[in-house]
Amino acid sequence: MPAARYQHLDDPFWTSLLALCAEAGSSICEHYNEPSLAGKLRAKADDSPLTRADLASHTILSRGLAALEPALPVLSEESDRSEIAGRRRWSRFWMVDPLDGTREFLERTGEFTINVALIDAQRAVAGVIYQPLERRAYYGALGAGARCYSWRESGGEGEAIRTSPLSASTLI
């Protein structure tokens, strides 16, 4: 994917990526609205929960990102070993947490997101943080700024987010 593509926040690339996150978010909300939330499948190796919502979002995002940019591999928190074999050699890839805040999801706090980042040379160069219940996305790219888009409040482009430049000595 040419850098110029994601560095223009009006590019159709962003429309596709935001729609993909919204689709994954809708799937998560279907599970969230189940009466029992009995969708917990098991605990992962780190003892964090894994739900049907995690897996549904993972599937939607993995397939969608592969269609959006076929040459880029996807590293997802829910990927199995075969999907991420050779990841140390990847210089450009998608990094995904299909449901960040699974415990909060299970507790119904509403405090969970979908996180998608484009990594290039070990650096995040573009990304989306999507809040499924709010139907709101924060997205941006290195050198292009950031925007917020709400499907509830907007009918057009995302609203620019004012940011301050980082100094060379800033630690994050």
Task: Please provide the spans of the model-predicted regions.
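N-terminal subdomain of lithium-sensitive/metallo-dependent phosphomonoesterases centered on the IMPase/IPPase/PAP
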Residues: M1-L99
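Residues in and immediately flanking transmembrane alpha helices
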Residues: A67, G86, G110-T113, A144
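Residues that scaffold the ATP/ADP-binding catalytic core of kinase and kinase-like folds
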Residues: H31, E104, Y149
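Flexible, active-site-adjacent loop/turn segments at secondary-structure boundaries
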Residues: G39, S48, R103-E104, G110, ...
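Glycine-rich active-site/cofactor-binding loop and its immediate structural neighborhood
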Residues: W90-E134
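Acidic beta-strand-loop-alpha-helix segment within the catalytic core
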Residues: V116-I172
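Short, function-defining helix-loop hinge/capping sites that tune catalysis or transport
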Residues: S62, A85, F105-R108, F112, ...
